Amino acid sequence: MSLWPFGETLSHSGIDSILEEYYLIFRSLEGNETSSTDDKKNEPSMESESEFGTESRDRSDLNQSFIDRILLETALLDELNGAANDRLVDFICLGYFYDDRSQQVRHMDYLVDMLMAYLKDIDRTGYRTPFLLENSFHQTGEYEDQDDEDPMLYVNIISSIFCSKSAPIVEALVQNTPFLSSLFEVFQFENIEAENCPILAVFLKINETLLFEQTSSYLEFFKSQPNIVDKFLYHIEVSPLVEFLIKIMLTDQVESPTNIIDFLYHQDLIPKCLNLLENSKYSPGIQNSSGELLKALISISTNFKLDTLWIGPNRLTRQLASPQYVDQLINIILFQRGHAMGVAVSIIIELIRKNNSDYDEVDLLSTTIVDNPPSQRDPVYLGHLLYELTMHMEDFYALLIKLENDDDDDHDTASKALPSVKHHLLENQLHESFRPLGFERVKITELISEMLHCSNMGLMNSKRGEKIARTRDKCRDTLDQNSLEKAMKNLNINDNTITSNTLEDKCNNNDSNDSNDNQKQKKNIKKKFHDNELYSTFDTSDDNIDDDDDMSFEIPYVSETQNLKIRKNPTIGDLFKIKLHDLGFFPKFLQLFLRYPWNNFWHNIVFDIIQQIFNGRMDFSYNSFLVYSLFDFKKSTRFIPKPLYGSNQKLPVKDFHIISDFILQGHKDSFEFYEKEKTNLGYMGQLVLIAEEIAKYSKIYKTDLIAPDIYAFLQDEVWMSYSSDILNETRTMCSIILGGGQFCAESDENTNQDFLEKADMSKPAHPSTMDENEIVHEEDVKLHDKVAELIDELGQLTELDIHDKIKDVIVDHHSDLN
């Protein structure tokens, strides 16, 4: 048996033979029709003529058999991709044949029609294939001997030709508008979403090739398609289609814009996606897909470059963060509830995380409109989003309380404003009955946590930043309006009818000139500001913006004077924190923390909130008042305006102390559970971390300068004993690596030292070197002894020892108080 690749050689020879025969007939017909002999030098050799004969030819000889035979040649793709066979490329792109009616049919048109016919047949018959398109037709070499025609054979071949590395083929394809239009008809196929149906794979394979190889031409065609966004959203559950739409968006780079983002903006992509978040009309799968599309858009539109998949801030994300659509998201949270609520919350969270103003490339507080004219590529300002959310804090709290009341009373029907969601009793592995916390309460708290992150951003705590952002927004709208008017003037209007040069075409420049045009546009805008064409419209100077709006604090930070000063003219960040304080969110979160001891996801969210509060600046914004409310909520209510809680209205929480009612109470409850089950409650890990934050806070700040009451709480005998004894020992015990032994770093150092000592034994050592080695060795021995002593000491400390100390310090103290 020979291993020589005869098949490849014969196949290559087969393609050449087919082409020789085709071109011989082609030239013969051409010569008969024109009676010209000027192209003798291009005619085939005499050997070829003798092989195929020199008899006269007619049009029936130049039939479709040539292209059909070429398609079944196994070396076809290799010739197109690797060998760069120009004759073969010309045959496919420029060649033609005559059909039975003597009509000329171009090979490209024939392949296009054949592909679409097979795709329609696959859709009609519900054809399925377990194979990927990458499985080429080489693996079905015996196909031509079969009686039945497999549509996937030709679908694979033709789609591979269209996706080859041959530039003329791809260029000819992208210029074939009828084919591209017919290819987009697959959106109407019934089986496009069916599992293992190859139609979608063929569509994406061809379109992605055209997008990456002929970006400008392909996008022009894409923009010309009617209702293209609706077509994608109709199949939004098909994730490959959504990913393809994201790839199209990624072509609109800051340095080389394609204006596809503006096109999608005018096609109402954002409102159409948000309209899918309706529980009564759309399934959870559709809602999830809509949310994933918006979050993917946000991820590639961050205000700072994370990776190559980045286009920067744009009109779509700016629109999503605008008051109108933030209100729509809020209404979904409050009134749709359920699955739509979870998707809406995840969208808002992603907006905040990916548009942190602290990472903006251009600092609004240190620039001017003249130096940095506003554009749609400016970082997205989150002030509008945070303000709209803050204005609905009462609604969020009411929903939180309503969900709690639903748990407390299964028959509560008093509140009809919001739909009721009952949580039935469940049983855990310890055979304890419990009512689940619920998805909605977790989502509300997760939203509050992210809003707190947003409120700590620099721009959210600057009145000057708010004014600058508003000015830039107005200026940006004016620039957009001027561009719109200019585009309208350039429209060709005949007999009151707008020609094909539509506003869209005016807005979308050719890809080759986009970068230069973009730079020219920026220079023109900057020149207009300097020439006072737009400068006079807005007061863009910083003279009108008072730096004193950003207030400094007096000592003590927590005082009635400081409270009134902040509340009189709060920043957006302070306004949110004031709402948090007045509504009593923190005591409620911490109470639910203890009530649901096994919901670790909830515990992590609450810990994140508390950690943010204690790590915030105390001399900046309303943070110090939030900390004060954690230590003594009852006293902190004196800072709440009286009209908020009148004489007939009860406070949301009567009193709450984070040390006694949370840290110590949580330890006490866990102690009692440990007595019965010999294990701690599930929240103990996060509770200890919160206690660590309080201890760290007391060491970093002079708490008597913040509020004397806080200092007094931290000097409490029980807290002092707990923080210096139980907390320290818990921290030390938890720092030991699992399985015992020395610390990893120390172990590595000893291993390296032993290796060096063994390596040096074979060499005569210099006296000074020996002295140094002895000193190092002695130090290592001392360090080793100290570590061993520490490990021995820790080895005597167990969970039971800490449990006993909790009893002595906390439990017995509670008993004495009672």
From Swiss-Prot:
Residues 33-60, 499-526 are annotated as: Disordered. The keyword Cell cycle applies. Residues 509-518 have a biased composition (Low complexity). InterPro entries: SAPS (IPR007587). One of its GO terms (molecular function) is protein phosphatase regulator activity. Hyperphosphorylated in the absence of SIT4. Keywords: Cell cycle. Associates with the SIT4 phosphatase in a cell cycle dependent manner. May be directly or indirectly involved in SIT4-dependent functions in budding and in normal G1 cyclin expression. Belongs to the SAPS family. PANTHER family: SIT4 YEAST -ASSOCIATING PROTEIN-RELATED, SIT4-ASSOCIATING PROTEIN SAP155-RELATED. Present with 279 molecules/cell in log phase SD medium. This is SIT4-associating protein SAP4.
